[in-house]
Structure formats: C-alpha cells, structure tokens
Amino acid sequence: MGKKTLPREGSLRRTLVLLLGAAVYAMLYALCSQIDENGVSCMDVTLRRFCMGFPIAACILYVLFHNVFPRMEFRPDTEQNGKPFCIWGAVLLIFLCYIPLFLIEYPGTFSYDSMKQVQQIASGEYSTILPLLHTLMIRLCISFYGILGSLEKCGAIYSLLQMALMSLCFAMICAALSRSVSRRAARIGVAFFCLYPNHMAFASSCTKDGLFSACLTLFMALCFEEAYTGKLTTGWRIIRVLAGVVACLMRSNLLLAFAAWLLVLMLTRKQGGRFLLREGALVFSLALICNALLAGMTHASGGTVKELLSVPAVQMARARLYAGDRLTDRQKEMMDSMFAVNAENMEAFYQTYDPTVADSIKNFLDEDAVRSRWQEYLALWVSVGRVCPDIYLDAFLNLALPSLYPYKTFHVTHRYIETGCGNALTSPFGLPPLSLPERFKPVQQWLDVHLFSTGADDVPVIRWLFNCGVVFWLLGAMVLFAGYRGDGTIVLTMTLLVFYWITHLLGPVMQGRYLYPFLCALPFFMARPQRKSSTEPLRRKNEIKTDEDHDGGSVDERNHL
C-alpha cells in the first residue's frame, strides 16, 4: 500500500480529533495510573503526569492514524479471489473449538445470577431484575428433567444450546465481514472467535452476557456492513432487528444506550445514517413491547434502581468513611437514612466498603426511601460532592478502573471470570449437589488459579489478552480514527457501543463478563475496507447508478462516441 496524502479541507477536523484523543488518553493515564498504584489520586501528580503524557499520546496517535491503521485496511475481493464465505462451516468450526472447555467445566458454568434465576423458576415468582428471556431459556432446559432425570444433563443442554447460538451469531458476523470488507478479514474473524480464551469461557457459561454480547455484536456488524456497502438484503435486515431486540431483552441498560443513540441520530440528521435511525427505532420499540409481554406472561414483579445507584452509593459511603470530619451532622443523618441498616450497626456497615465492588453498600439501599425522597437524596449527593470532590473521584475511579486503564494488576475483589457449577441448579429444588466427573479436575484448577481468578495476571502474554483496559483503549483509538478519517456514518454506528460503555461505568463491579461485548466488537471495529485514496467516501446507500446499467455503456464511452 502506497503512501497516503491527506486533503487540506479536513486538516482542522483531524487536528481537533488528534488533540482531543491525546487529551483523553493523557488524562486517563494521569488519573488511573495513580489508582492502579495506590488507590488514591493527587492533583499535583495528576497535572504532572498529564503534561508528560499529552505529547506522548499525541505522537503515538499520529503514528497510528498515519502509518499503522491505514496499513491494516483490507483490499476488496475480486470475483476470482477464492470461494464465498461458508457460514455453516464457520459455525461448526467455532462450535468445535468451544467443546474442550465445555468438557473441562462440564456441564458448564452456573454462577453469577444463575442461582437467583433458578430460584425464580422453582418458586414461579419472576422478577424483571434479571432478564426474563434468559430466565425462560434456563426454564426450558430444566423442563427436560422429567425426561432425562438429571439436572446435570439439563445443564449440559443449556450449555450446548448457548454454544450453538453464539457460534451461529459469530459466523454471521464473519459473513458480514466477508461481504463488506474481505474474505481475508472474515477468516481472521473466525480465528478470533475460535481461539480467543474469553469466547471459550463464556460460550458454556450460564450468564446473560454471552448471548447478549453475540447478539449486540451481530446487530452492529450488520449496521457496519450497510454503512460500508450501502445495501443489505431483506433477510439480513430481519436478522439484524432480531439480534438487536434479543440484546435489549438480555440487558436493560442497553435500552438506555439505544435511547441516547437515537437522540444523537435525530440531532445529527446525517443522510448516510438514516438507516441507523430507522433500524434503531424499530429495535427499541420492539424490545419495549417484548419486555412488557414477557412481564405480563410471567406476572413478573418490577425491577430495582439499586444497580443504577451503585456509583453514588459508594461515593457517599467512601466520603462518610474517609472524610467524615468534612460532613455535617445533618448530612450524616440523611446518609444513614438511605440504608436499611440498624443505627447500632451503621459504623460497622460503612467499614464493609470495598473500593472495587459496590455490592456491600448498594445492596442495603432502602429503595422505598430512595424512591419517595429522591429529591432530598439528590441534593445530599450534590452537597457532599461539593465538600468531597476528591473522594467522589477516587471512589468512581477505583470502581471503574478496569474499564478506563490498562491496569498492571486486576484489583477487583471478585474473580475475573467465575467458573464452576456449585448448587445453583439443585439447591432451589431441594436436591443434593450434582456429582460431577473429575477427570479434568487438575486442568480445571490450573485454569481457575492462573487465568480465570485474576485475569491471567501472572501469565506474561495472555494477561494482556484478558486486560480490560487494553481492549477499551484499542476500541477508543478506532473510534477516533474513524472521526479522523471523516467516516461520519461509521462514527455514528460506533456511538451505540460508546453509550453502552457509559452505562457500563455506572455498574457495581467490573468483571470479565462486562468486558465481553466490547471484546466481541474488536473484529469489525478494526477491519476496514481499503480505499483507493484517502478522500474516497464510503459507499452510500442507494448509490446512484450510471447510465451504463441502462444503456449498455458508461457516460464517458457515450460522450466519446
């Protein structure tokens, strides 16, 4: 690929994007490197590290945008360049790559919220706190107990079903890469989905994040395809809508991201992004309808606001614990009234604060009090923040560090990826624990200790594949590169994942499963079709056909004649 020259008319945009990106990365380094080292930040150190990091970040981004990323673009296929991409062959290959870890963890991983979901199934009392679609999927597999007589086999059915569905989604994502970028990009995508360790771990894990990530990635990959090629068949449009709806049903905070995304699409009114607004509005509407139908069918109770209040809860708890002398008695009394904890146990309750996990604090929020007096508590949160801005900042950074910075050590108290089955399938039904085979016990223990517990902190190369911050920084660089090149429709498409990342920062803990949808997005964020020149625009939807299509010759040929 030859040396590229950039037009003058985009120089201001490129300069602004470069400076903005450098400022963001420098600030993240200045703040988060301190949190990674000692858990607190200092203004003087922050300013010093920002001034040091800004020019370095600007130089690195300039090299990436001018020399590295353009060379990673794929040449478009020609008609004679190999056979068409085989979706079902890719499905089989990806599925077979997930079998070994499934056998090691047989009948699969049933942790995270699995116990709560099985308890809902056993009691018949459902709640929208957990995704109803995923709970009903587990119920479907457990319903085979009458035939199989073993919950172990029911769990294996769930794992195999999820592995098949995720393999199908990943194969369709690679097919979209083949059509919109190149078959070589699709083959690299297949290798990525086959061999990346996280895919193997989550394919047989009973968590909503597996199918959610696969469906969200498929939805976005098909949006990228239409943005690049300007066309998409009716069948693939239907698949795109279904994937988007299922993703929204699996995670309610994606609905918030969709709402913000649609607002941006309406405000920008970019011609090339009209299909995004149309498809996004359809997915958003259908997801709301399906959520209401599922809740009505199962008579599910309402959800909770505790998850959304994770960050404010830990910020005030940290302020009470570490800066109580700055607070007034009135503020302390108001803060105590937020939590369903006895007065004599209140001090011990604040001592349970964990900087990396919000569960010990937000689980004790008095939801009725918060709902009825939300204006007072909002004013309390603001007033405490005015006197403790440093405490608030450190509380947020400690909680969100894995999503903001390529950390040296995985500091989170919870495991990076939870494995094992435990009593999740049997305890809610009053049955004895499963008797699982132990033929792969040594391998399972080694994986738990060296990979899944700490995100491979002690494994030299693999640790960077598991590092959440590396993935987020790489995705951020690709978003900036799209803006640097002036690919407006691509930037708008990427914005959906950016908004989901923002909602993700408000969560109670950062584990590997929260990284997973962003990890799945890497192939189509990084795979870009090669342009003939740096100024060539993306192929637009409903491209204007030349007279050659109608009259048997091009305009230039007829003018020559």
Model-derived regions: residue spans:
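Transmembrane-helix motifs of polytopic, lipid-linked glycan transferases
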Residues: 59, 160-180
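Membrane-proximal stem/loop segments at transmembrane-domain junctions that anchor or position
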Residues: 302-438
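Membrane-interface anchor segments at the N-terminal boundary of transmembrane helices
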Residues: 153-157, 394, 398-493, 497
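Loop-to-helix entry region of an early transmembrane alpha helix in multi-pass inner-membrane enzymes
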Residues: 132-136, 147-168, 190
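Membrane-interface alpha helices of multi-pass inner-membrane proteins
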Residues: 237-251, 262-263, 283-287
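Short acidic/glycine- and proline-prone juxtamembrane loop motifs at membrane-interface regions
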Residues: 204-212, 250
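Short helix- or helix-capping micro-motifs
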Residues: 94, 186-197, 244-248
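Extracytoplasmic catalytic/substrate-binding loops of multi-pass membrane glycan-assembly enzymes
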Residues: 105-117, 125-141, 148-153
